[in-house]
């Protein structure tokens, strides 16, 4: 019997041989999308885990640095301010002792910080004052509440990297920008028992707000604006207002060259220059 052959169009043959090919390809594409999403989620969870590990290590470091000569109240206060500060344990300990010294010595004047971020150091001041039964001191918070001002070429970190370069390469969410809106700072202050009317927030560049809006007499002055120009301006206008026996803290002395140069230039003009006590990489001065 003779063989019979049929000519079938290629498209029809494909449909005959693989009737479900299109559906299978669609399912494979969906599986690939799902797999990509899964990989993304795994990466996110891995990053979250790394963040948790980093926070745990930070907490462990904080706890191991809680000095044996600190009492339980000191430890509790420092733990409470942790969410509001980037300040090290040594600096917070020094600040605690400075506030206590001012109270015990009866040093007259208000408390003032330039560059507050979320207000953690002010929280600590208020808590130490309140626990000592002192609620009549005004506490001034000077900040742009919009992040750091523009650094200059003199502002270089301890690794030799310019602050401007670091900021340009960093997201504005990075800590070097130190952005904390006024509303966020005010909300933090409202968690404290210290009289709210005693907190005086001054918004703007310190070059614009000081000396005009600064208190006349200062018992404790904490400078944390990082850069040469701001630190120089603060010292030149505020040192004369610090009460004899009062305390000045320069937070970024060891972190940024500009802050250190401004501090050294100013104090070396005094006769005699004061002793700068080290607290972490900050410097603490008691005015004679």
Where do the language-model regions lie?
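S-adenosylmethionine/decaboxylated-SAM
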Residues: 68-89, 105-288
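Boundary detector for helix-to-coil junctions that initiate low-complexity/charged tails
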Residues: 1-74, 86
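Conserved alpha-helix/loop element of class I SAM-dependent methyltransferases that forms part
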Residues: 94-106
